[in-house]
Amino acid sequence: MERKTVVVIGGGAAGMSTASRVKRLKPEWDVKVFEATEWVSHAPCGIPYVVEGISPKEKLMHYPPEVFIKKRGIDLHLKAEVIEVEQGRVRVREEDGEKTYEWDYLVFANGASPQVPAIEGIDLPGVFTADLPPDAVAITEYLEKNPVENVVVIGTGYIAIEMAEAFVERGKNVTLIGRSERVLRKTFDKEITDIVEEKLRNHLNLRLEEVTLRIEGKERVERVVTDAGEYPADLVIVATGIKPNTELARGLGVRIGETGAIWTNDRMQTSVENVYAAGDVAETKHLITGRRVWMPLAPAGNKMGYVAGSNIAGKEIHFPGVLGTSITKFLDLEIGKTGLTEAEAMKEGYDVRTAFIKAGTRPHYYPGSKTIWLKGVVDNETNRLLGVQAVGGDILPRIDTAAAMITAGFTTKDVFFTDLAYAPPFAPVWDPLIVLARVLKF
């Protein structure tokens, strides 16, 4: 049997999932992974919790490099930056110089990078992004070596809120600045974000609809200046979004999709033969609308890698697409969604109806009940459930159940008659998700 060489660019979740899958199916093949940092199989989602101090930085690697090298037989190159890609070859800058490697199959799994605004002072000591494990190391070391009381977080998305939480938990004075009129505006409808903003305002200085003009300081950061004021800052986190790393793919002539990420089919193949893409660098299909979307979320990235590796090794498997199911929290307030928001559904041309309910997560007589708010979005024409958003307590089982229901094409009637488990320690007899379906009507 002919021995093939697979080159994977990127040693994150998608890249290592791809490499591991190929080696499982084709152990005799040569699988090389090039990772620009010294971290492999890393978990950037854990950065806020390392900064908060509840997790050691070493835990940001799911497996140490030795597992992939010795147990799985992957030729892993760390601190190895791929600087050029050609048909059949890659050029890599490693610690001992530049080298060229050949490939039969190539996988782009080189993720995404922070979108850093081009403002004065962005390079001052004490200004950080929170994108990769080295950022967590740099932030924690800065906290250890410098007096930090005032922290400014620029951004209003998931990463911004999670980083703000980390510093609130550390007892810092936190200011959260965003140019949008709402936090999480692209992901949630206003009913949800109103509750989130009330919680934020109780614990930090929330400044919306403000444009950051510059960051000031002499030897290190001292303040952040916006078009509405200035805020003291001993440390600044810039969390204003990310963009897919498509430069190498463009150089090979790979098609870039309408989202700005690499176009792939449902086998994770790109427009160039024997070239694949997976994870945050790749776009995919939305399960409801069928449109091309870019949703850089960890569960999808891992599965994309699994699919890419399977197909490279000759085991055909298809990636169906995504719903954008996601969850986060700020202190004890959980925030999550799956499927389409009302705004997204209307933009797609759906005639929708919605419901927004408040419920308890256990019977009133059983201790530990938490308040949960749910918003449901339904297609008026078919009664199909299009999306669910949640905020409050114990939201995960509701969001995950809703994701399964939406994937299966449930109507509100299907949701209402789903036989969910009940016992007082776990849920009320009328689960909030069932109540939502009842209010949405069928």
From Swiss-Prot:
What does UniProt list as catalytic? C45 (redox-active)
Q: Which organism is it from?
A: Thermococcus kodakarensis (strain ATCC BAA-918 / JCM 12380 / KOD1)
Q: What are the alphabetically sorted keywords of the record?
A: FAD, Flavoprotein, NAD, NADP, Oxidoreductase, Redox-active center
List the InterPro entries: CoA_disulphide_reductase (IPR017758), FAD-bd_OxRdtase (IPR050260), FAD/NAD-bd_sf (IPR036188), FAD/NAD-binding_dom (IPR023753), FAD/NAD-linked_Rdtase_dimer_sf (IPR016156), Pyr_nucl-diS_OxRdtase_dimer (IPR004099)
Which molecular function term from Gene Ontology is one that the record holds? CoA-disulfide reductase (NADPH) activity
EC number, UniProt record: 1.8.1.18, 1.6.3.2
Q: Which residues bind CoA?
A: R24, S41, H42, A43, P44, C45, H62, Y63, R72, N302, K358, W430, R438
Catalysed transformations (reactions)? hydrogen sulfide + NADP(+) = sulfur + NADPH; hydrogen sulfide + NAD(+) = sulfur + NADH; 2 NADPH + O2 + 2 H(+) = 2 NADP(+) + 2 H2O; 2 NADH + O2 + 2 H(+) = 2 NAD(+) + 2 H2O
- Please list the residues that bind FAD: A13, A14, E35, A36, H42, A43, P44, V82, D280, A298, Y422
Query: What does the subunit comment say?
Result: Homohexamer.
Q: Which Pfam families match?
A: Pyr_redox_2, Pyr_redox_dim
Question: Temperature annotation for this entry?
Answer: Highly thermostable.
Q: What is this protein called?
A: NAD(P)H sulfur oxidoreductase (CoA-dependent)
The cofactor note from the UniProt entry for this protein is: Binds 1 FAD per subunit.
Q: Which domain of life is it from?
A: Archaea
Q: What does this protein do?
A: Catalyzes the CoA-dependent reduction of elemental sulfur (S(0)) to produce hydrogen sulfide. Can use both NADPH and NADH, but shows a preference for NADPH. CoA-SH may act to solubilize S(0) by forming CoA persulfides, followed by the reduction of an enzyme-S-S-CoA intermediate produced after both enzymatic and nonenzymatic evolution of H(2)S from the CoA persulfide. Also catalyzes the oxidation of NADPH as well as NADH and predominantly converts O(2) to H(2)O, with a preference for NADPH.
